[in-house]
Amino acid sequence: MFLLYEYDIFWAFLIISSAIPFLAFLISGVLSPIRKGPEKLSSYESGIEPIGDAWLQFRIRYYMFALVFVVFDVETVFLYPWAMSFDVLGVSAFIEAFVFVLILILGLVYAWRKGALEWS
């Protein structure tokens, strides 16, 4: 049976690290002056009064680029520890990593064929 008192430092750090941001927001909310006016409600565009609607929508194509980037960024996160311990893991880990990369390459080819990587 494991002993819970061995985790006292962990729980102390968890409580302190959770309390510090909460206290920072609480103290800034209590000490900051609250002045509402028309200037606070206007949108800021480099010190110039906004002309027209200040709302800007992103095209859906940007979403696809971001999604493909996240997939390959996560791939890098998974492959880096594997590459650092490649000599210890052996051939089976190499085959598993190869299958992992192959599945991601198939996904990239599919996205490419569907036109997800074209900005037009």
Swiss-Prot record:
Q: Which domain of life is it from?
A: Eukaryota
Q: Which cellular component terms (GO) are annotated to the entry?
A: chloroplast thylakoid membrane; NADH dehydrogenase complex
Q: Which reaction does it catalyse?
A: a plastoquinone + NADH + (n+1) H(+)(in) = a plastoquinol + NAD(+) + n H(+)(out); a plastoquinone + NADPH + (n+1) H(+)(in) = a plastoquinol + NADP(+) + n H(+)(out)
Q: Does the keyword Repressor apply?
A: no
Q: State the similarity comment.
A: Belongs to the complex I subunit 3 family.
Q: What HAMAP family would the database entry show?
A: NDH1_NuoA (MF_01394)
Query: What is the role of this chain?
Result: NDH shuttles electrons from NAD(P)H:plastoquinone, via FMN and iron-sulfur (Fe-S) centers, to quinones in the photosynthetic chain and possibly in a chloroplast respiratory chain. The immediate electron acceptor for the enzyme in this species is believed to be plastoquinone. Couples the redox reaction to proton translocation, and thus conserves the redox energy in a proton gradient.
Q: Which protein is depicted?
A: NAD(P)H-quinone oxidoreductase subunit 3, chloroplastic
Provenance organism = Aethionema grandiflorum
Q: What lineage, starting at the top, does this entry show?
A: Eukaryota, Viridiplantae, Streptophyta, Embryophyta, Tracheophyta
Protein's gene: ndhC
